[in-house]
Amino acid sequence: MAVVGVGVDVVDVDRFAATLARTPGIAMRLFTATERGLARPERLAARFAAKEAVAKVLGAPPGLEWHDTEVVLGTGGRPSLRIIGTVAAAAARLGIASWHLSLTHDGGVAVAMVVAET
């Protein structure tokens, strides 16, 4: 396996929460129903950071759909990525076969780091 790309994104939790409160429809556009069920702003901010980090790994090609990247929790609560549709197609063009995700939120910021490998 070889690393194809690394993406990192940082989101200010309070600012993100204010955006969600000001524009309620944005959550529908950005998150899957499962993700929206996590309601706590720091969790949503971390998931948005993950989606941004994935886009950075892919070179942010036009046409990526936010819902095509979903953060899911595996055994023991470990986060991972579910990639479908436009994001899966962009990943296939780059030969990406596996994804690694790390999320954290502390001190008012949420951070996601994504590594993609062939």
UniProtKB/Swiss-Prot annotation:
Lineage: superkingdom: Bacteria
Any one GO MF annotation of this record: magnesium ion binding
Gene Ontology biological process terms in this record: fatty acid biosynthetic process
Cofactor dependence: Mg(2+)
Annotated positions binding Mg(2+): 9, 52
Classification via InterPro entries: 4-PPantetheinyl_Trfase_dom, 4-PPantetheinyl_Trfase_dom_sf, ACPS, Ppantetheine-prot_Trfase_dom
Keyword presence, Amino-acid biosynthesis: no
Predominant cellular place of this UniProt entry's protein: cytoplasm
SUPFAM superfamilies registered for this protein in UniProt: 4'-phosphopantetheinyl transferase (SSF56214)
Pfam families (UniProt xref): ACPS (PF01648)
Enzyme nomenclature, EC number: 2.7.8.7
Subcellular location: Cytoplasm
Catalytic activity: apo-[ACP] + CoA = holo-[ACP] + adenosine 3',5'-bisphosphate + H(+)
Class of enzymatic activity (EC top level): transferase
GO cellular component: cytoplasm
Keywords: Cytoplasm, Fatty acid biosynthesis, Fatty acid metabolism, Lipid biosynthesis, Lipid metabolism, Magnesium, Metal-binding, Transferase
Biological function: Transfers the 4'-phosphopantetheine moiety from coenzyme A to a Ser of acyl-carrier-protein.
Family from the record: Belongs to the P-Pant transferase superfamily. AcpS family.
Name recorded for this polypeptide: Holo-[acyl-carrier-protein] synthase
Species of the source: Frankia casuarinae (strain DSM 45818 / CECT 9043 / HFP020203 / CcI3)
Gene: acpS
